[in-house]
Design a protein with these regions (language model features):
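ATP-binding N-terminal substructure of ATP-dependent carboxylate-amine bond-forming enzymes
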Residues: 1-48
Length: 48
């Protein structure tokens, strides 16, 4: 995997804008949340 990556802890409604901004900047988003149904998990490149 080439390119820059970012890890965002939490995928709730408050983290969705941060995930989207990171993706708009061309970053590969790795998102961690215990809730697999959190909204940010659907837009992350690699949800954990």
């Amino acid at each position: 995997m080439k390119g820059k990556r970012i890890i965002i802890i939490g995928a709730g409604l408050l983290q969705v804008p941060a995930i989207q901004i990171a993706k708009d900047m061309g970053l590969y988003t790795i998102v961690l949340d215990y809730n697999k149904d959190a909204p940010g998990m659907k837009i992350a490149d690699y949800p954990i």
